[in-house]
Amino acid sequence: MPEAVEVAAERGVDISGHVATRLRPGMASAADLVLCMAGEHRDLIAREEPPAAGRTFTLKELVRLLEDGGHAEATPAARIAAAARDREAGTVRPDEDVADPLGLPLDGYRAIAAELDDWIARLVSALWDPIPAALGSGDT
């Protein structure tokens, strides 16, 4: 995918030597967090490796759960666990996939890269930003 290499280079990242690998048995179960771009991938991992199901999300799904939940947990791992509990109590939305740029022109790759930048920035904020004093103090 020369388009992906070009768009990454425009963002200062060299992926020219990157080689995709298949997910092997045990990889997802050993991970602290598995982020997928599509719900079908998340669902396949949950079926194939049930121990990983609570730590496997689409990128957009996890961001939504973290932002909507207002979690005051102190650590990223605790926030992820709370998001998994919220998912069990709620719904999975079909519109939480990231589009696959394969076959798109270069501008399509750029658009998806910009979308990923936004979602990843939101994820980092939701996982690592300090807890607002009003949430963490117990005061209402």
Which residues does each predicted region cover?
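Short polar/charged helix/loop
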Residues: 1-140
